[in-house]
C-alpha cells in the first residue's frame, strides 16, 4: 500500500507544472517617483486584486500633493522608502542638503511609517549619500532589472524586457507615473504569478534570504545564497 501511494504521489508531481511543484523564485517590485494621483490608485487597485505587496520609493513633494494616496500605500501593507524630497541628483548635493531631502520627506509620512531604504534619484550615489544614509540608518536601494519604463511607453516592450531578464531575488525598477507603466506592471505580475513566482517587498525579500541590511550599503538584489561546497 505504501509503495502504491508513493507511486501515485510521484505521478502527481510529474503531472504538475514545474511552477506548481516548486516556486521559480521570489522578486520585489519597486515603484519610483510617486505617489501620483490616478496612476498610483489604479496600481494599488491592481496590486490589491492580485494579493501583491510592493515597495514604493516616494518623493516628498508628491507626498505633499497626494497625502491620501500615501496613506493608502501604507495602510494596504506596502513598503515605503525615500526617493528624496525634490528628486534632485543627490551626487550634486552637500551632506546637509541630502539630509534635508530625507528629513523633509520623513515629516510628511504617515504616523508609524519608518523607512529603511533610500533610493537616490537615478541611482546616483556618492560618498556623501552613503555617509548620510549610514547616519540616518538607511540602506541604499538599487535594482537589478530596469526596463526604463519612464522613457519607453510601450507596455508590451516593457513587459518583454522584464520577463526576459528576471531571475530569482531580483529587484525590479518601475514607475507609477503613466498608464503604460501601470499596465505593464500588472501584466508582469499576471504572467509571473501564473508561472508560480512570488512577490515580496524588498524588506521581506531580504529577510527571506537571511540578509542583514547595513546602513549606507547598497543592495541591488537578493539571490539565493550559494550552498557551501560539500
Regions found by a protein language model. Name each.
Residues 1-4:
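Positively charged n-region of N-terminal signal peptides that target proteins for export
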Residues 7-15:
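Bacterial N-terminal signal peptides
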Residues 19-108, 114-115, 187, 191:
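Active-site beta->alpha N-cap acidic-glycine motif
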Residues 33-37, 61-64, 79-80, 86-90, ...:
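Solvent-exposed loop/turn segments at secondary-structure junctions
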Residues 42, 88-113, 122-168, 181-187:
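Alpha-helical scaffold elements lining the catalytic groove of polysaccharide deacetylases
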Residues 49-50, 64, 180-230:
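C-terminal domain-boundary segment and adjacent tail
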Residues 53, 79, 139, 146, ...:
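Residue-level detector of anion-binding/catalytic polar loops
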Residues 55-57, 81, 119, 141, ...:
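Structural detector of well-ordered beta-strand residues that form the stable sheet scaffold
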Amino acid at each position: 500500500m505504501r509503495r502504491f501511494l508513493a507511486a501515485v504521489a510521484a505521478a502527481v508531481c510529474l503531472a504538475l507544472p514545474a511552477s506548481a511543484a516548486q516556486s521559480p523564485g521570489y522578486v520585489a517590485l519597486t515603484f519610483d517617483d510617486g505617489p501620483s494621483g490616478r496612476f498610483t490608485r489604479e496600481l494599488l487597485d491592481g496590486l490589491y486584486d492580485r494579493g501583491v505587496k510592493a515597495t514604493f520609493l516616494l518623493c516628498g513633494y508628491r507626498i505633499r500633493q497626494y497625502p491620501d494616496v500615501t496613506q493608502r500605500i501604507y495602510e494596504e501593507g506596502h513598503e515605503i522608502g525615500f526617493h528624496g524630497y525634490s528628486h534632485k541628483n543627490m551626487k550634486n548635493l552637500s551632506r546637509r542638503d541630502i539630509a534635508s531631502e530625507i528629513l523633509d520627506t520623513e515629516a510628511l509620512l504617515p504616523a508609524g511609517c519608518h523607512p529603511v531604504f533610500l533610493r537616490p534619484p537615478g541611482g546616483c550615489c556618492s560618498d556623501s549619500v552613503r555617509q548620510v544614509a549610514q547616519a540616518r540608518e538607511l540602506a541604499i536601494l538599487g535594482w537589478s532589472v530596469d526596463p526604463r519604463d519612464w522613457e519607453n511607453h510601450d507596455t508590451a516592450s516593457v513587459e518583454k524586457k522584464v520577463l526576459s531578464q528576471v531571475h530569482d531575488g531580483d529587484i525590479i525598477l518601475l514607475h507609477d507615473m503613466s498608464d503604460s507603466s501601470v499596465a505593464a506592471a500588472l501584466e508582469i505580475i499576471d504572467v509571473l504569478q501564473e508561472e508560480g513566482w512570488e512577490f515580496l517587498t524588498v524588506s521581506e525579500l531580504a529577510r527571506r534570504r537571511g540578509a542583514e541590511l547595513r546602513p549606507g550599503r547598497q543592495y541591488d538584489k537578493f539571490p539565493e545564497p550559494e550552498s557551501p561546497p560539500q
